[in-house]
Regions:
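Short hydrophobic transmembrane-like helices used for membrane targeting/insertion
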Residues: 1-4
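Intrinsic disorder/low-complexity segments enriched in small, polar and charged residues
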Residues: 8-10
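Walker A/P-loop-proximal flanking segment of P-loop NTPase domains
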Residues: 12-134, 140-151, 224-253, 529-534
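The catalytic "switch" region of P-loop NTPases
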Residues: 16, 29-48, 73-77, 114-117, ...
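An acidic- and aromatic-residue-enriched active-site/binding cleft used to recognize and process polar
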Residues: 98-101, 131-134, 369-376, 409-412, ...
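P-loop NTPase nucleotide-binding core
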Residues: 101, 105-358
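Amphipathic alpha-helical scaffolding segments
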Residues: 109-116, 125-126, 383-389, 497-500, ...
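C-terminal alpha-helical "lid" subdomain
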Residues: 210-250, 277-279, 310-311, 459-534
Length: 534
């Protein structure tokens, strides 16, 4: 019979405590359960090696707390200096790297480096634009196309042009700038990235007009409506224009005068004066004609802009309402995206750069990442090519005081070598800082592991990767194994799995803190096989 202790509440505890008196019989699976409770834990292994947490638990730099807290400013890929360049003279860099090679980590490090540069040189700051969320722009482009093309992702991506990408970059840049001026969220209050109020006050009227015009055209915020943000910015800039209201004032005054005259003429005893009443509608039409002409002219302009601004959703009526707040003299001959060509976009980019220079940002850097993630791309190499290739134009890549950091999947490098002479003459990749293969050597991966272990170590501890293994596993073999895994993500996955498998082999009563070479080799083979299948 089983003895059941009094006061047992949990059914699991009741089951486990129901052991036979005298140990005549004890189910095998319960013995295994007891053994599992005594298995050596990962934390015991880490504590023995003076580690406070597992350095290899995270594989994605976006969520990797060890990287963000300790390694972001001290552990770099060997190609780091070529990619980052000189922040005082922004330049383009093109990186081709496989999944897990560290492109996202490099993006975060670039952002950190630019922030540090801006703190050190407040008069030579760099305006950073993150261009890594393509879904909203591609969705708007898809809706602008004919119905027969909307259902085909290849046709949508094939229709992309350089000016579409420039519109998206201008939208990102203008939206960020307006956010910082209006201080719409806490992230815009970072001193290294904020816009000083005295610099805003020093803008001349032409620059204020340019900023408002860029806002009306490109602002694409999720925190407020376009009209609300435009009005708030106009108030902040103290931009007052009376000329646009003159046609309305003339029309209202003329209407009031016409009503008075019609009453006067109708009361007149003279018959011929009464006939003049019929001329008043023509006079009213003439009085309001100036306003009507201006309304119609701006409405046509708004329609042209909305039609050719394919990566943003714009309402012609709302845009017309904003454009009519500028005088005709201030609006005439200003570049607007009212045709499908890149010249207008370069002129608008230069206007944005001049504004940024006056606000303390003489340089501008755009970081392009995650080109494999948009819904229309879905990780397909051919579609990634259609998305990225329009950006590879030397006129943009070598634009003055402007740099693009393109962090691209390694699959795209295959297409580079097979492109036409015309493509290479347009892109001039020989003039860009190209990292053709974002590879890691075994030694570099070893140093990366060591730095992460030091970041997770107890105070005054100096752990080494070699401390994990038995003496029969040589350092040469360990580095060669790391080389075969090629990327940090694969290495972290391998080491995490290796520690887990090692702990499963031993009980807490008889722990072993050195990993055997046979387990090392077998786990390595499994991880390599899984990587080949992906």
């Amino acid at each position: 019979m089983y003895s059941i202790p009094a006061g047992t509440n949990s059914k699991l505890e009741l089951f486990l405590e129901a052991k036979p008196a005298g140990n005549q019989f004890y189910p095998c699976f319960l013995q295994g359960f007891d053994n599992a409770r005594d298995t050596m834990t990962e934390q015991e292994f880490l504590t023995h090696h003076q580690l406070t947490r597992n350095p290899f638990a995270d594989e994605d730099a976006q969520t990797d707390s060890v990287f963000r807290e300790f390694c972001i400013s001290g552990t770099f890929h060997p190609s780091w200096s070529k990619v980052v360049g000189d922040s005082k003279q922004p330049a383009t860099a093109v990186v081709f790297g496989s999944k897990g090679s560290g492109k996202t980590a490099m993006r975060l490090q670039l952002m950190r480096h630019i922030t540090a540069h801006n703190e050190q040189f407040p008069e030579q700051r760099v305006f950073l634009v993150e261009f890594d969320d393509f879904n909203s722009y591609l969705g708007a482009l898809q809706e602008h196309l004919p119905l027969r093309q909307q259902s085909s992702p290849d046709k949508v991506l094939h229709s992309l042009r350089l000016w579409d990408h420039m519109d998206a970059i201008l939208s990102q840049g203008v939206t960020q700038l307006v956010d910082r001026i209006l201080q719409t969220n806490a992230s815009n209050n970072i001193p290294a990235m904020s816009v000083r109020q005295d610099a805003i006050d020093r803008l001349d009227r032409g620059q204020r007009r340019d900023l408002l015009l860029l806002t009306a055209t490109f602002d694409h915020s999720k925190t407020g409506t376009l009209y609300t943000r435009f009005s708030a910015l106009k108030k902040r800039l103290r931009f007052i224009t009376l000329n646009p209201w003159m046609p309305v004032v003339i029309g209202v005054e003329s209407s009031a005068l016409a009503i008075w005259l019609s009453y006067f003429l109708y009361q007149s005893d003279s018959e011929w004066l009464k006939y003049l009443v019929w001329l008043l509608p023509a006079a009213l039409a003439l009085a309001w004609g100036m306003f009507g002409y201006r309304w119609f002219r701006h409405h046509l302009l708004a329609i042209r802009v909305c039609k050719n601004l394919r990566v943003l959703q714009r309402d012609p009526g709302q845009l017309r309402q904003l454009l009519m707040q500028f005088s005709d003299v201030e609006l005439d001959e200003q570049p607007l995206p009212q045709s499908q060509r890149s010249d207008d976009r370069f002129a608008l980019l230069e206007k944005l750069q001049l504004l940024l220079r006056s606000l303390g940002f003489p340089g501008m850097i755009v970081i392009v990442d995650r080109v494999d993630e948009p819904e229309l791309v879905n990780g397909q190499a051919e579609r990634m090519k259609q998305l990225v290739w329009p950006l590879l134009d030397n006129k943009l890549l070598k634009h003055e005081n402007f740099g693009i950091k393109l962090l691209l999947p390694s699959e795209l490098h295959y297409f580079i070598d097979r492109e036409t002479r015309e493509f290479h003459e347009r892109a001039r990749l020989d003039k860009q800082n190209v990292v053709a293969s974002f590879d890691w050597t075994g030694e570099a991966l070893y140093d990366l592991i060591a730095s992460r272990m030091r970041a997770c170590a107890s105070p005054d501890a100096r752990p080494s990767p070699r401390d994990f293994f038995n003496a029969d596993l040589t350092e040469t073999r360990f580095i060669a194994a790391l080389q075969s895994l090629t990327t940090p993500r694969n290495v972290f996955r391998f080491l995490y799995r290796l520690i887990t498998e090692h702990c499963k082999r031993f009980r807490s009563e008889t722990p072993q803190f050195k990993i055997a070479s046979d387990l090392f080799e077998s786990t390595l083979a499994v991880v390599q096989a899984e990587d080949r299948r992906q």
